[in-house]
Structures are given as structure tokens and as C-alpha cells.
């Protein structure tokens, strides 16, 4: 579950990055094609439509614009030939001629299958790429569990996006409190407590059945909301019969006036704010845990590019935490004199310093073999180091402190590691790491 969650967050980050790049691209005339095909669409339909468009575009008066549009349609047709059918999650294709920052024209073609089904159909020729439909991929589809429990029965449900589902409900007949009974009053009270206890136990057992995935033994929901009109919900949340794995997932305990489906709807309304901030809460928890390791000086943490990469190479990092807008590039540089390959990680200021592109001892020039954002490199390579990758924002107080105070990169370690012992191995170059 955690791995799936982490993978999904990385896919979302990649889409965000792609949208950012596509939104800023501009072209001359209407030579930029945005094409989105939902699942179960037909490639043949789109191919025919593009052929018709090609015929229409041949009549464009302006020669330059006509050539650009025809070229973009041809690119789209060529790319579609690679697909026999639309992939299960749909297909997104952007192609056209864009104008670069230095005024040159450049052909771009991007096609991919989204990480989850896209429910949009789009074909537009314009002077920009249309990315609005991609925003639905960024919407959270986290699933939340709801347990609505009162004196008449319990309802188990889930909410994902705007879709609510009732998994199961059952009713109970609990004896009411009463003052009669004479000598039997204590016995009645005991029977009543026993029935209440059995009711809580049954609810706890069913909760485990519905909200724990038997294959992974992990919760299949991102959070749990307990709701009800009496104190049953509180009793359940504090009961030792309630699975501790689910106890850790409780986001909120709310009072509702009804039981059953009406109570379910009311619980959703009352929890709306908490559910919308769940990513925010997870981020605060993660960075809070990181700060706790630092304040207790456990040695199970690492920060800064250089130390984090050393710990990664050793396989010591369990969770790699990176600010989603970290502006550092990874350079693969070749020393032309010795043929040696050097890896450097440089921020914007360091890129302007030419000494970073020369050998410190011989002053030989280092030729750039490859340059890519460090974030992208992490997204592609993190699994190789056996860690999970978590992107964080600087919107929460903790996130902002992490970005300002720790350079926006760090990790929680599997075991204690004193990074100072590796300092003498370093050559003192900031953001540098050699293969």
C-alpha cells in the first residue's frame, strides 16, 4: 500500500512537471496539436479525423502556417501508427512546432498512457498546448473508510473522490437501561454490558475484514472516520478489540444525529475539511518524524545533497524526502585529459561559476555529457536504492522549515550512521558525488 501510494505520488509529480512545461510552450500560428483519447476510444476514428483535418489544413492561405499545421498533423499520424489500440488508461498526445526562448523553432512530440484512466476526449489545433484535461489526473482519488455506529446498528462505507459506497450494514437490538428488576437489577445491567461488549467486538472484527487488505496485511484506506450519535464510536476507537493498524488510520471522530445512510452522509459533510487536507496531514507527519530523529540525535537521519547521496549509495536510506521544486541539476562531466567521468550536483548559482566545470587540480575542462534535474533522476532511480521517495511542498510550516533549513533534501535511515566519518573521504566540493 505504502509503495503504491509512493508510486502514485511520483506519477502525479511527473504529470505536474509535464503540465508546467507544456503550459509555457508557444508556437507560431495554430501548429500545436493537443489530442486526448479516453479508454475504449478507437484509433481508426482518430486516424480518419486526422486525415480529414489534413485535407482542411491544405487550404490554409498562409504558407508558413499551412506547412507547420500539416507537419504537426503528419507527426500525430506517425505517432498513432505505433498503437494498435488505445491503451487501457487512454492516450495523451501533444505534437507541434514550438518557439524556444532564443527564438528558434523546435519540433516536439510527447505521447504517453496516463497512470489512471482519463475521462476526456480532446482534439485542438492552437498556438499553445491545452493541458486542462490533465488536471483531473492530479485530483486525489484516496479512499476513506467510514464506520457509522449507534445503538441501533452499524454501517461500513467508503468514499473515494465523489463516489460513496456502502460496504455492509447490520442492526442490533440492545436492551435499554431501566430502573426495575429488584434483585435482578445487577444481572440486567451485566447482561446489558455484555451485549454492548459483543456489539463493539463484532464491529471491530468486521472493520478488520473490510478495511485491511488480506494480501498485504495493510489498511486499504488512506484514513478512517468514526461517526455515531452515542458514545459507541469513542468506545470502539479506544477498545483493544479494534485493530491497531486501523487505530493508526483514524482521522476524525464525529457526532452525527442519525445512524445508517443519513448518518453516513452527515459524517462525509462534517469531515470534508479534514479529508481535503489529508495529503497535508501526511506531509506534516512525515517531516515531523524527520525532525524528531534530529532533535533526539538518533543518527538515523541525513540531509543535504552530498550526504543523502552517499547514504543512498550505501542502501541506508529508508525514506528519501525531497522538496518537489528542488532546483538542482545532475551533471555527468567528462575530463577530456584523463577520460574520467565526474558526477556533480549544481544549483543555479553554482552553474554560473565556471570553476565547477574545470578540474580543481589540473584546471582541465570538464565536458558536459549529460544534464538532468536531480528530481527527475531520483524519480527514475530511487527503486534501485531500495527506498521510498516522498515529495513534499513548502506550504506547511514543517515543509517550509525543511526546505529552508535543510536545503529541501534529506532522508530517514534504516540504521544509525555517522556521516561525519565520511567527511574525510569527501573532497570538499559542495553538491558533488563521484561514481
UniProtKB/Swiss-Prot annotation:
GO cellular component terms given for this protein: cytosol
Entry's localization field: Cytoplasm
One Pfam entry name: eRF1_2
Family: Belongs to the eukaryotic release factor 1 family.
Protein task: Directs the termination of nascent peptide synthesis (translation) in response to the termination codons UAA, UAG and UGA. Modulates plant growth and development.
Complex formation: Heterodimer of two subunits, one of which binds GTP.
Official protein name in the record: Eukaryotic peptide chain release factor subunit 1-3
Species for this entry: Arabidopsis thaliana (Mouse-ear cress)
Amino acid at each position: 500500500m505504502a509503495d503504491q501510494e509512493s508510486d502514485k505520488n511520483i506519477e502525479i509529480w511527473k504529470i505536474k512537471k509535464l503540465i508546467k512545461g507544456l503550459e509555457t510552450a508557444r508556437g507560431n500560428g495554430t501548429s500545436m496539436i493537443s489530442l486526448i483519447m479516453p479508454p475504449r476510444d478507437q484509433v481508426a476514428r482518430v486516424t480518419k479525423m486526422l486525415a480529414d483535418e489534413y485535407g482542411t489544413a491544405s487550404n490554409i492561405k498562409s504558407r508558413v502556417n499551412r506547412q507547420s499545421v500539416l507537419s504537426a498533423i503528419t507527426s500525430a499520424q506517425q505517432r498513432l501508427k505505433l498503437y494498435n489500440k488505445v491503451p487501457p488508461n487512454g492516450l495523451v498526445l501533444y505534437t507541434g512546432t514550438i518557439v524556444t526562448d532564443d527564438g528558434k523553432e523546435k519540433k516536439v512530440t510527447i505521447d504517453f498512457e496516463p497512470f489512471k484512466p482519463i475521462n476526456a476526449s480532446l482534439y485542438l489545433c492552437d498556438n499553445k498546448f491545452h493541458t486542462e484535461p490533465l488536471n483531473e489526473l492530479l485530483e486525489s482519488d484516496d479512499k476513506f473508510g467510514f464506520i457509522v455506529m449507534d445503538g441501533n446498528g452499524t454501517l461500513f462505507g467508503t468514499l473515494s473522490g465523489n463516489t460513496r459506497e456502502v460496504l455492509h450494514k447490520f442492526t442490533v437490538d440492545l436492551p435499554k437501561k431501566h430502573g426495575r428488576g429488584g434483585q435482578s437489577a445487577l444481572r440486567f445491567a451485566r447482561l446489558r454490558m455484555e451485549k454492548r461488549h459483543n456489539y463493539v467486538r463484532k464491529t471491530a472484527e468486521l472493520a478488520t475484514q473490510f478495511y485491511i487488505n488480506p494480501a498485504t496485511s495493510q489498511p486499504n484506506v488512506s484514513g478512517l472516520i468514526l461517526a455515531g450519535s452515542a458514545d459507541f464510536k469513542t468506545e470502539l476507537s479506544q477498545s483493544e478489540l479494534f485493530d491497531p493498524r486501523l487505530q493508526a488510520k483514524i482521522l476524525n471522530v464525529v457526532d452525527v444525529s442519525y445512524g445508517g445512510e443519513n448518518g453516513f452522509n452527515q459524517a462525509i459533510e462534517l469531515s470534508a475539511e479534514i479529508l481535503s487536507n489529508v495529503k497535508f496531514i501526511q506531509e506534516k507527519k512525515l517531516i515531523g518524524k524527520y525532525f524528531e530523529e534530529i532533535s533526539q540525535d538518533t543518527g538515523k537521519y541525513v540531509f543535504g545533497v552530498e550526504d543523502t547521496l552517499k547514504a543512498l549509495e550505501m542502501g541506508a536510506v529508508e525514506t528519501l524526502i525531497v522538496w518537489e521544486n528542488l532546483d538542482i541539476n545532475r551533471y555527468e562531466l567528462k575530463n577530456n585529459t584523463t577520460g574520467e567521468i565526474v558526477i556533480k550536483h549544481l544549483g543555479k548559482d553554482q552553474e554560473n561559476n565556471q570553476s565547477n566545470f574545470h578540474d580543481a587540480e589540473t584546471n582541465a575542462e570538464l565536458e558536459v555529457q549529460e544534464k538532468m534535474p536531480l528530481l527527475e533522476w531520483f524519480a527514475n532511480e530511487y527503486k534501485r536504492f531500495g527506498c521510498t521517495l516522498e515529495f513534499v511542498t513548502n506550504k506547511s510550516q514543517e515543509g517550509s522549515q525543511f526546505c529552508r533549513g535543510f536545503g529541501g533534501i534529506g532522508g530517514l535511515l534504516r540504521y544509525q550512521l555517522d556521516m561525519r566519518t565520511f567527511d574525510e573521504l569527501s573532497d570538499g566540493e559542495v553538491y558533488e558525488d563521484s561514481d
